[in-house]
């Protein structure tokens, strides 16, 4: 392990906004990517003994993680509210947006340091979509920089390759056809095109041999194969029954 003190690394479960597109019901405000919605997610996480919430794509613009922040989201307020409830906050970022698709520059460390000082617990870094030398080198640099500032990482679009043994602040890898695919699963002749239950018991042997796998589980609605439908803002999982 290349991190001398790992006591700050706290794995945990996450309440995920993107799964149902922030589609809250029974609230007295307009749900969406805004501060009241994420406070509700923090409440949910606290009530259900989850450790984190994630603020997914949309909290910032595509060009800057420092300046182009959504005016509907007050990160400092959410961090303070989360601290009261014992809930940490993870922010989404695309790999290219954060790094430019390569080495870690001083500007990248400035972003990581800025949000670490704010009280953010880590980043979900998305859309690597490659595992060549550039991506692997970038991942190692990101892990070291994040560890320096006590930040966790969840890497999406990248399969595990063992780096978490050197940098255990990397908690997960998503390089898998996860449950989110049920949001847009094609329906053919009245049934889903793919057999999710069969895949679910096969995927661990394809992806988890050398590290963890972020399948993004958590569907609260489960349907039989004949009743399954892909509904983006009210998604469901597929069960084994016909």
Residue ranges and their predicted role:
Residues 56-237:
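Aromatic- and carboxylate-enriched substrate-binding clefts and catalytic-loop regions
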Residues 239-242:
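Catalytic cores of secreted or luminal carbohydrate-active enzymes
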Residues 1-86:
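Conserved structural scaffold segments of CAZyme catalytic domains across common CAZy folds
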